[in-house]
Amino acid sequence: DQPFQIRIDYKAEKKLDDVVFGIAIYRSDQVYIYGTNTLIDYSTSNTLDGEGHIDLKIERMPVNAGEYSIDLAFHRPDGFNYDFWREACSVTIQNVKNEVGVISLSHKWDVQ
């Protein structure tokens, strides 16, 4: 349940306005864990011109141990794809607990 950051390096051959950046996270068995993009998050309009990078900082990654893959997308607000990378990278999550399921819920036991 540690902070997690995704950095996407890009090189735009020409200036692109109103670019939406998106990610999707899948477990190794292709269970869809999470997805978001800058349009969903009401981010400001993004313009790409030349080279740079985009950082997505995730404050908590409360998934259980396992292998996960991340899809990356750059598209217009109307859905026209500039670029899409299926399984652009993979991540191994390790936990000290042996919980089961998809996520690790923050919890306390209170036995009286």
Regions found by a protein language model. Give the residues of each.
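Localized sequence-composition bias
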Residues: 1-112
